[in-house]
C-alpha cells in the first residue's frame, strides 16, 4: 500500500497540490518514526533528519498526558495546518511512490523486477477516483 505523488510537468514534488494530496500520509510515516523513537530511542532515517529536531520540539510543547494523542491526531485522515511545515520533498520521496508519470512507470517496472506483483494505492478520500484514474491513464498505460 502506497500513497501516490504524481508530479505534473514542471511541478516540484513538494508543491502545494502534492503536499495537500499526500501530506496526511507522509506525516503518518513521520508519526510512526517519532513513536518508535519515543519508545526505543531509535534514530530517524536520513530522510527524516532535516525536520526531526523541530518536530520533536513542536511535539514537546504539548502536555505529556496528551502528547501521544497529539502525535497521531491527524493520522492518515487530514493534513494538520500545524504540521504542514514538516512535509518536505525528502519525506514525500521516501514515503510515497513519487515522480512524473514516466518516472513512476520505471519505478513500478523496477518493483516488478524485484518481485512485486501487486500495488495498492492509498489516495486521499476527497480525490480517490481522480488519483486512481490518473495512475491508470498516465502510468499503467506506459507499462
Predicted regions and their residues:
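Conserved, mostly hydrophobic/aromatic
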Residues: 14, 111, 135, 139
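Structural motif
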Residues: 114-115
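Histidine-centered catalytic/metal-binding microenvironments
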Residues: 123-124
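An alpha-helical appendage that flanks or caps ligand/catalytic pockets
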Residues: 1-110
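C-terminal helical cap(s) of enzyme catalytic domains, especially alpha/beta-barrels
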Residues: 128-143
Amino acid at each position: 500500500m502506497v500513497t501516490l505523488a504524481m508530479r505534473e510537468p514542471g511541478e516540484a514534488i513538494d508543491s502545494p497540490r502534492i503536499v495537500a494530496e499526500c501530506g496526511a500520509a507522509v506525516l503518518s510515516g513521520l508519526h510512526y518514526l517519532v513513536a518508535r523513537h519515543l519508545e526505543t530511542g531509535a534514530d530517524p532515517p536520513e530522510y527524516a533528519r532535516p525536520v526531526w529536531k523541530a518536530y520533536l520540539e513542536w511535539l514537546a510543547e504539548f502536555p505529556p498526558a496528551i502528547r501521544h494523542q497529539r502525535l497521531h491526531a491527524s493520522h492518515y485522515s487530514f493534513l494538520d495546518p500545524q504540521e504542514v511545515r514538516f512535509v518536505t520533498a525528502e519525506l514525500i520521496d521516501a514515503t510515497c511512490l513519487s515522480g512524473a508519470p514516466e518516472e513512476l512507470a520505471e519505478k513500478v517496472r523496477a518493483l516488478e523486477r524485484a518481485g512485486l506483483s501487486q500495488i495498492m494505492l492509498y489516495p486521499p478520500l476527497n480525490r480517490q477516483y481522480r488519483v486512481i484514474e490518473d495512475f491508470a491513464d498516465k502510468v499503467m498505460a506506459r507499462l
